[in-house]
């Protein structure tokens, strides 16, 4: 005999979940509402950063779709193409490249997403849109480069901010928008395991699943479609790992020409630096990408936000978060490796000293 006792319906469970947090980002939601009012009648462009990741593409897709549902004419522009594994998010949408808009006479109000500063979209897009109307971002190093600055460095992802704002304001989140937002949160939290992952992340993720996001689809597209070239690149990266600072820092190097020799490309570097950080006893991991012209790109990761890698990156005109930062040197810099390791050593010493201070 089946019990007549039933639990709450799915609708009631979803309503209860929404009530757990009445408002996710009250000040930013009010600011976004004012932004929408100020943009009435204008054409818009949503711009992301170079080498776009899940949070960047997810933010662009979601924001563009919500703005279109409000009647706006919106396009998305990136300096680089959408990575192969993220193309599922933008199905049915056109993403333009820098050259497509550089000489267009069409005027559009620019909204930058997931960009800590104006230049993250590249110098040419910065020049094409010198006065963005808004920036929506979560980087600790954000410099506040737009009149409407919707920035919260406590958020794990720009998609987290957008999801909260859309829910706060009761804006329409369809299944594709939910998938984009969920994927952005999932990737920037390291599949919900980084220090930035909060209760709010899980509540928002649940709301997005209720609106059509499929975690399994995101997991398959992102983590179960590796190419042979990516695995060859990983092999070279692991073989290059060096331990520094009494084995508390691990650095891997990708030499110039490695993409051609392995049949990989720049998007295949995604996630490699996490292997350097994952070693037991290592506090900081780094990936250095050397270029043929002698310049460098580096990705930095820490296990503890106390190490403030955004400060390390800032020494080289980079930026980011306390646990995840990056830099891109456009000019040849002698002894870059030694200088970077020295900067790591300074942060380790500062954290060690703080832990020994009275009252810690």
Predicted stretch roles:
Residues 63-64, 127-130, 151-152, 203:
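Glycine-rich, phosphate-binding/catalytic loops in enzymes
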Residues 102-105, 125-128, 142-143, 173-175, ...:
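Solvent-exposed alpha-helices and their adjacent loops that cap or buttress functional pockets
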Residues 94-148:
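Active-site cofactor/cluster-binding pocket
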Residues 1-19:
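N-terminal amphipathic/basic-hydrophobic helices that include classical n-h-c signal peptides
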Residues 87-89, 122-123:
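Metal-dependent catalytic neighborhoods of phosphoester/phosphodiester hydrolases
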Residues 92-95, 129, 151-154, 303-304:
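Short, hinge-like loop/turn segments at secondary-structure boundaries
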Residues 136-204:
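Short alpha-helices
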Residues 18-50, 56-87, 102-109, 187-360:
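Hydrophobic helix-and-loop "lid/oligomerization" segment in the mid-to-C-terminal part
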């Amino acid at each position: 005999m089946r019990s007549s006792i039933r639990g709450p319906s799915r609708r009631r469970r979803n309503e209860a979940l929404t009530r757990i947090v009445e408002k996710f980002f009250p000040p930013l939601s009010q600011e976004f509402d004012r932004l929408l009012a100020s943009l009435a009648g204008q054409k818009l462009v949503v711009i992301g950063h170079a080498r776009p990741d899940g949070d960047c593409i997810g933010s662009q897709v979601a924001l563009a779709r919500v703005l279109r549902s409000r009647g706006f004419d919106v396009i998305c522009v990136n300096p680089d193409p959408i990575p192969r594994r993220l193309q599922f998010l933008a199905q049915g949408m056109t993403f333009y490249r820098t050259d497509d808009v550089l000489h267009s006479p069409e005027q559009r109000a620019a909204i930058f997403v997931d960009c800590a500063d104006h230049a993250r979209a590249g110098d040419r897009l910065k020049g094409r849109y010198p006065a963005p109307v808004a920036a929506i971002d979560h980087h600790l190093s954000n410099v506040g480069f737009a009149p409407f600055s919707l920035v919260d460095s406590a958020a794990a992802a720009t998609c987290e901010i957008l999801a909260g704002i859309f829910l706060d304001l009761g804006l329409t989140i369809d299944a594709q928008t939910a998938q984009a937002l969920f994927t952005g949160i999932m990737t920037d939290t390291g599949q919900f395991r980084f220090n930035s992952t909060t209760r709010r992340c899980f509540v928002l993720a649940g709301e997005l699943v209720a609106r059509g996001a499929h975690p399994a689809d995101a997991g398959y597209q992102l983590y179960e479609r590796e190419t042979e070239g990516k695995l060859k690149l990983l092999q070279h990266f692991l073989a290059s790992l060096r331990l520094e600072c009494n084995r508390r820092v691990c650095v891997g190097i990708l030499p110039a020409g490695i993409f051609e020799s392995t049949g990989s490309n720049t998007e295949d570097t995604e996630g490699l630096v996490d292997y350097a950080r994952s070693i037991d006893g290592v506090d900081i991991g780094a990936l250095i990408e050397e270029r043929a012209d002698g310049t460098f790109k580096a990705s930095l990761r820490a296990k503890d936000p106390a190490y403030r890698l955004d400060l390390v990156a800032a020494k080289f005109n980079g930026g980011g978060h306390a646990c995840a930062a990056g830099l891109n040197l456009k000019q040849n810099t002698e002894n870059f490796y030694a200088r970077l390791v020295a900067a790591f050593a300074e942060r380790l010493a500062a954290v060690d000293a703080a832990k020994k201070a009275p009252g810690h």
